[in-house]
Amino acid sequence: MRIKRTSNRSNAARRVRTTAVLAGLAAVAALAVPTANAETPRTFSANQLTAASDAVLGADIAGTAWNIDPQSKRLVVTVDSTVSKAEINQIKKSAGANADALRIERTPGKFTKLISGGDAIYSSTGRCSLGFNVRSGSTYYFLTAGHCTDGATTWWANSARTTVLGTTSGSSFPNNDYGIVRYTNTTIPKDGTVGGQDITSAANATVGMAVTRRGSTTGTHSGSVTALNATVNYGGGDVVYGMIRTNVCAEPGDSGGPLYSGTRAIGLTSGGSGNCSSGGTTFFQPVTEALSAYGVSVY
């Protein structure tokens, strides 16, 4: 049974998030979408782009992610290797009169939730990565991905599941992708660091920001933010909104791990495609939203 917070977005809220200003898409191979007039490119209004976004959501094709590019005034739809030409045509058909607003791009690999401070944490459902240690007064918690805490109750520090860390006290997935675990083991060190990097504050991502990710599978990798407020359809009804898109690689087991920029906490690893041998696209839950939802802070 899934544990969910009661803060799921309404359709109206989703539309607001979708129409937020976005930019900086990663370089991926494009599938050309013909325009009505190639010599004079059309421009599309915010309402048309929102309608196109709703149409892509309604098409419900797993392995897709989309966000608005304010420079070209197009809805950029990224499709992974599992999406067929027929499904791409289905997306275009769903967009109807706004199909010309779509720019469809192909990325290698498959979008997946990456379940299997970066340190490994274990539940009855698998292994994830600890995001950031946080606190509210004298009570200590850690943040991780919501698809990790969804359905998980107790968390351990080792694969043998003999050293208890704590219990899930909140989870928000799908729609969002964050969860919080309250420490119940008072003997566990609760450093406010990620590896050797001290984390002193939290910040919102910006396009082009240099960022670093740490995870229990692949360790530490760096890259940059390529877009904001992306929607990702992982399949099976698991759609998340408002994600940070990056060109930082990640692999299964890295889920929930921290994304940071210097001393600032930025996000929690959600999912993506590719791997750390060939590269890939990875999406992150903004950490400021989770901190606000649970009334906690980094330290």
From Swiss-Prot:
Enumerate the InterPro entries for this protein. Answer: Pept_S1_alpha_lytic, Pept_S1A_streptogrisin, Peptidase_S1_PA, Peptidase_S1_PA_chymotrypsin, Trypsin_dom, TRYPSIN_HIS, TRYPSIN_SER
Q: List the disulfide bonds.
A: 128-148, 249-276
User: What span is annotated as the signal peptide, if there is one?
Assistant: 1-38
State whether keyword Disulfide bond applies.
yes
Which PROSITE patterns did the record assign? Answer: TRYPSIN_HIS, TRYPSIN_SER
Say yes or no: keyword Hydrolase present.
Answer: yes
What is the E.C. number?
Answer: 3.4.21.81
What terms describe the molecular function in GO for this protein?
A: serine-type endopeptidase activity
What's a Pfam family in this record?
Pro_Al_protease
Its annotated function is as follows:
Has a primary specificity for large aliphatic or aromatic amino acids.
Q: How does it assemble?
A: Monomer.
Q: Output this protein's name.
A: Streptogrisin-B
Organism, by scientific name, is: Streptomyces griseus
Instruction: Print the organism lineage.
Output: Bacteria, Bacillati, Actinomycetota, Actinomycetes, Kitasatosporales
